[in-house]
Amino acid sequence: MLFRISMSATEFLLASLIFCLVFWVIRASRPRVPKGLKNPPGPWGWPLIGHILTLGKNPHLALSRMSQRYGDVLQIRIGSTPVLVLSGLDTIRQALVQQGDDFKGRPNLYSFTLISNGQSMSFGPDSGPVWAARRRLAQNGLKSFSIASDPASSSSCYLEEHVSKEAEVLISKLQEQMAGPGHFNPYRYVVISVANVICAICFGQRYDHNHQELLSLVNLSNNFGEVVGSGNPADFIPILRYLPNRSLNGFKDLNEKFHSFMQKMIKEHYKTFEKGHIRDITDSLIEHCQEKQLDENANIQLSDEKIVNVVLDLFGAGFDTVTTAISWSLMYLVTNPRVQRKIQEELDTVIGRSRRPRLSDRSHLPYMEAFILETFRHSSFVPFTIPHSTTRDTSLKGFYIPKGRCVFVNQWQINHDQKLWVNPSEFLPERFITPDGAIDKVLSEKVILFGLGKRKCIGETIARWEVFLFLAILLQRVEFSVPPGVKVDMTPIYGLTMKHACCEHFQMQLRS
């Protein structure tokens, strides 16, 4: 009996010693906090894995709940890596806009190194002058071949011309499906239509809806968001990269295929390039490459490989977000037929049936705009921005944040914050309409989907225009529905962009 007590005491002392040692190591590894500041609060995590189990399959929901307890600035660990989590509109604006230079970095995550060989403008760790110059170049190219007018076209700009053409083709494809099987999965056709718009802008060409190479790429695109979504364990626990992982393998395959596709397109452009006859974004980048200078001030060279990376970023930015937005919009239309009828009544009143909707109609269609805003808010299909990191030691709301800290920005929390929204779980486009029938500008600016500040999505304006025009043309011509009794699954599937479950039961009829 004495021996057992002695052993128990020894074990207790040993366990206490180990606990104290671990506690001391954790405390010692924390950065020294300057006087007057404090460490961000947060729950204790498990050894080695941190808060992975707490995040679960829906990190945006778990971290939103956590923010209710710990506040808008909190800290978790994924593996052994500390991660700052920001919530609340005012806090996020403070960090990304007012303190934009402090929070404009990108963490050097493993999945990010697989995109464009680690040289992606959107995902790469660079945030210095080279990155800024490449971003300006991409913005200018995007503007020149989307918002700018085409002298040879009756459309107001290139984007309107491309979207109008693809929307008409899309309606024809859906009519074929109704004449055949009698139902369809809209995502299968929307994804090619949207891809064709960005292909026209980047490469000056479109593809048939049955083009196998393009189909292969877009069908793999869901895997991209699954891997690079905030909180992927393989980014924070290195050993997981070497275990069997179907998603990660698919992600590598997708990036290789996209890179190969872009290289082929750019090689073809080089063969037919004519100085002074710039056809698309790729041509404009080749021209800059040959001049060996990005702009007059930076004197930064743009290599052939950088052209591939810039085009890849533009293609990704202009494809997945718009496809997901339109797809979610169609889901909300069939589950809210009252809203669909109200949009169509507005279209009939403002535009009629004698001409096609144009981008210039957008300001005269407030209910359509309110529907799009509510789709963005309610679905919050981009739950987090691409993770940020701090570029230097800084502070936020009285908390000390060291240089190099990985930062998650919870956009979903903003869009469902009960402090900002009445009944946030309810889908109600009318919340954005003022008593005099206009869009509530102040409220609309509280919907955050494209990020803020220096890392804000460069294609935001074009994406909003494209979503509007696709939906306006479709809803002027057709009505969407599902058969009576069919339940539509609106549960989001977590990723960088959250998709909904596949719905094969869509039906469409031309409006009388």
Swiss-Prot record:
Highest taxon in the source lineage: Eukaryota
Record key words, sorted: Cytoplasm, Endoplasmic reticulum, Glycoprotein, Heme, Iron, Lipid biosynthesis, Lipid metabolism, Lyase, Membrane, Metal-binding, Microsome, Mitochondrion, Mitochondrion inner membrane, Monooxygenase, Oxidoreductase, Steroid biosynthesis
Localization of this protein: Endoplasmic reticulum membrane; Mitochondrion inner membrane; Microsome membrane; Cytoplasm
Membrane topology summary: Peripheral membrane protein
GO molecular function: estrogen 16-alpha-hydroxylase activity; estrogen 2-hydroxylase activity; heme binding; Hsp70 protein binding; Hsp90 protein binding; hydroperoxy icosatetraenoate dehydratase activity; iron ion binding; monooxygenase activity
E.C. number: 1.14.14.1, 4.2.1.152
Pfam families reported for this sequence: p450
Residues that coordinate or bind heme: 457
CDD domains documented for this protein: CYP1A (cd20676)
Residues involved in substrate binding: 224
Region (Mitochondrial targeting signal): 29-40
Record's subunit section: Interacts with cytosolic chaperones HSP70 and HSP90; this interaction is required for initial targeting to mitochondria. Interacts (via mitochondrial targeting signal) with TOMM40 (via N-terminus); this interaction is required for translocation across the mitochondrial outer membrane.
Official protein name in the record: Cytochrome P450 1A1
